[in-house]
């Protein structure tokens, strides 16, 4: 259990152990991200012990992640290419491999004079937004 007074490193180690036991595939990353979300600091740069409020929030978020709620939902936003997307339940989470799809689509459209892109039923609309970022002349509908 994460408690007030824990050092940042001990708290993150505790989170990582619990998330690993729960079968979360990237427990080390998730633990560090949850810590950053709650404290606003990278664990490598933090030295102040956890406050009661921080410990309670970390504990709550860890329980939700242990129940396999996506990290993206816990954060409420997620990076995709060079922008942030708001995410939550009911929205497919943008993933790094989806960035490759957006980049490949943009490369494919590079020679097209007035490309038209339709992004339907793929989650946040991140594919269409990503193509638009690379091909500003594209007419994109999400």
What residue spans do the PLM features occupy?
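Short coil/turn residues that cap or connect secondary-structure elements
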Residues: 19, 23-26, 66, 113, ...
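Conserved AdoMet
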Residues: 35-107
């Amino acid at each position: 259990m994460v408690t007030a007074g824990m050092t940042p490193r001990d708290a993150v180690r505790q989170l990582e152990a619990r998330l690993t036991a729960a079968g979360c595939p990237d427990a080390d990353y998730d633990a560090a991200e949850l810590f950053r979300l709650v404290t606003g600091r990278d664990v490598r740069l933090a030295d102040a012990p956890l406050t009661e409020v921080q410990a309670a929030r970390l504990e709550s978020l860890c329980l939700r992640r242990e129940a396999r709620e996506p990290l993206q939902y816990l954060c409420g936003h997620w990076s995709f290419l060079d922008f942030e997307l708001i995410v939550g339940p009911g929205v497919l989470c943008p993933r790094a491999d989806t960035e490759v799809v957006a980049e490949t689509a943009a490369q494919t459209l590079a020679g097209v004079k007035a490309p038209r892109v339709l992004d339907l039923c793929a989650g946040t609309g991140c594919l269409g937004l990503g193509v638009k970022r690379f091909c500003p002349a594209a007419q994109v509908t999400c």
